[in-house]
Amino acid sequence: MTAKYPDKDSIAKLLSDENIPNQIMEHEPLLTIPPAIEYFTKNPPSVEAPFIYCKNLFLKNKAGGFYLITAAHDTKIDYKVLCKLFKTKNGNIREAEKEKLSLYLHVEPGHVNSFSLLNLSDEQKKEVQFHLDKTLLEKYKTIGIPPMNSSSTCWIKPDDLKKLLEKNGFTVNVTDLNEIKGDDKKEDKKEDKKEKKDKKEKKEKKDDKKKEKKDNKKNDNLDEDISSLGIQNKKEENFSDWYSECITKSEMIDYYDISGCYILRPWSYEIWEKIQEYLDKKIKKIGVRNYNFPLFVSQKALFKEKEHVEGFSPEVAWVTKSGKGEIDPPIAIRPTSETIMYPAFAKWIRSHRDLPLLANQWTNIVRWEFKNPTPFIRTREFLWQEGHTVHATFEEAEKMVYTILEFYRSVYEDLCACPVIKGIKTENEKFPGGYCTTSIEGLLPNGKGVQAATSHHLGQNFSKMFDISFLDKEKNKQLAWQTSWGLTTRTIGVLVMMHGDNKGLVLPPKVAPIQVVIVPIKTSKDNAEEILGKGNEIYEQLKKEDIRVTFDDSDLHTPGWKYAEWELKGVPIRIEYGKKDLSKEQVTFFCRDNLEKFPVKLTEVVDKVKEMLDTIQKRMFQKQVDRVKNSTTHAKDFDSFLEGLNKGHIVYTPWCKESFCEDNVKDKVKEIASKSEEQDTVGTCKTLNMPLDQPKLEEGTKCFFCGKPAKIFAVWGRSY
């Protein structure tokens, strides 16, 4: 069954509806207590003190039943104590299996929380007891609990949490988890005596093995713990948390205290600069020039085009105050710039000689999304380029639309090695107020489609509203034809999701901030000068060829640590070498995309780097092409369509092209999901686009859903 409260936004809405004060902070996933304590020590919440972060356990009793415990993070949870408190045999209390977490609470391991009780069915409520640590109510004003996912924390008064759960039909057992009677302590001491002796013997054996292993190391530093660098979540098991780990541990982003807003660090911003440079050259070649327009838009201008503003209205952020004074009327922060640019276009254009007007700006945009934010993919503030052009004819505008769409395809496929589908949006999915919308769509490894970029033919709708007109060669007044098009930092999220693996990022060479890292292996001071000298020599050779290279000769970490760090950051090629390699006049190449190693002669390093950068780029693209091909279903009927969606595929279907049919498909999928008890049943879907590269539509083909004559093939999928 679908969770009633699947994410932090649903919890935030519930707390708002109940008028319960709270603060929700976003951060990297805090799957265990130590990183959580470290994080909140550095980034304390703005809440009433004293406050404390909580640990949450979901336990099962072998004799029957489950317990969810919320306690102060420093409360010691002894399962023997719990057995006595819950009046069951020693050894009966243990952690619930992953499957039970999913079935009862709708969470993954590492994300157990008190709010997840709200997802229990009436029958499940009879099986689960909730115990709230007495310490929380007696000592703390505010407690921190993950709101369904440990990538954010909700700070709330413990009494408010208690009342909320009681209002929703739960008995809240306020329990002293440290409570043990004297007789029990004596019994425990007897029981524990042998156990402690056994543990001591095991520890001594373990320590002996560790010492033996350490003594065998040639380098005292080689036992350096590199586990903290690794990605804890598996891409194929927990995609969302894997993604969060990738982009934070690789230093692409940092979280900010306003939900949906993120700090882009150099490792991601430099990728954006590569994309910007690539696309900027292309649009300038066809005559587009860069502008910079204001961030703010007046209420009057924004509401001038009714259909347009209705499409963005829920996402518009308004400035309503200046100091203590009210701003009347309020000023909007641009969700897009049509209504800012077009009054200026109307002033600048008088004659056919002023056309075409081809404008672009690289800027930031604010859209106050209410959906669950995902860095780079769905955020409240993001970087983008937005192009706006004005033409004398429909055909000129149409040519511009498809020229830009091809540029966008090239950004994704040729630069980022991410395959996309070029196509036209349906009437339901097109840009509000436009004539038609074209798009490029991608398929992510989690089975979701993603709108990668859009190019819109606006027709004359906006030129009518803003009186963008010109005198033609015969001195007749004509309304102009317009286009708008945009590409965002979503590109970064897409390439991370497509190419990344369980070691971290895998960056396409063309956008990687660093394409090659050189890591020397020094075993003694005797050969350090020779080793470092050769590394510097290779570094200078590659730098002369405009290859983005770094030489990691730091003594702070071992080679093993450096390997893990640069693999996490996704650098395409690592060159590693030591004294033995140099004696053979060679180095070792490591390719990040397929994890292969091979020797390369010193005299061939530069040529081999160039060759491998090109090979890796092509290999990464082909790997994704093959993945998408294997994740595509062609369906002629609704059952096959649904089967494809539930596999995480995109689905090509013959379709009647009717908007009401599209709506009916969405409603039917949602209805089926609401009645299904299968965890993997898809609850939502949409048309991604109608591909420009159409399969052959045989005469007499029917719409896969309504049975009317099919007019076109559409691509459907789940989507961000």
Where would I find each of the regions flagged by the language model?
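NTP/phosphate- and nucleic-acid-binding module
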Residues: 1-720
